[in-house]
Amino acid sequence: MNILIDNRQDKVDAINLEELVEKVIKTVLEVEEVIDNVEVSVSFVDNEEIRKLNKYYRGIDKPTDVLSFPLAEFEDTYGEVEEIEEDSEEVQPIGDIVISLEKALEQSMEYGHSFEREVAYLTAHSMLHLLGYDHETEEERKIMREKEEEVMARLNIGR
């Protein structure tokens, strides 16, 4: 498994976040029983950079907390990356995650929990998007929320 983390901001201290993000990604893959020969890219940015990305890709000219850019194709069931053999040594990139640490810090204060908990949750949420989950309908939202809560519980990260 390759997890590439790039801190592209200097407004929020990112010390110790790499290890946390790696644990969350590995836990999501375990929960989803996804083979581990995948690659995920994570970028930490500030509100201005994520605002630009949000405007370009989603037409929304305001900062958001996290953006997910899936690269892999999925079958009808969640988390099953096509065209990868379990015994294959080929690493399959499944997507990119962009987290605004500035927004995550704001939200952690707003919601009354730790900054680390917010970053962990955003990472889990985004990973589930990379694995084919969405929250366009109430049923999809419920399924995705249950998965997020399972990941957070396995990591023993509460509110």
Curated annotation (Swiss-Prot):
Top-level EC class: hydrolase
Positions of disulphide bridges: none
EC number: 3.1.-.-
Compartments in which it is found: Cytoplasm
InterPro entries membership: MetalPrtase_cat_dom_sf_prd, YbeY, YbeY_CS
This protein's record includes keyword Cytoplasm: yes
Keywords of the record: Cytoplasm, Endonuclease, Hydrolase, Metal-binding, Nuclease, Ribosome biogenesis, rRNA processing, Zinc
Pfam family, one: YbeY
Cofactor notes: Binds 1 zinc ion.
HAMAP family referenced in this protein's UniProt entry, alphabetically: Endoribonucl_YbeY
Name by which UniProt lists this protein: Endoribonuclease YbeY
Taxonomic path: Bacteria, Bacillati, Bacillota, Clostridia, Thermoanaerobacterales
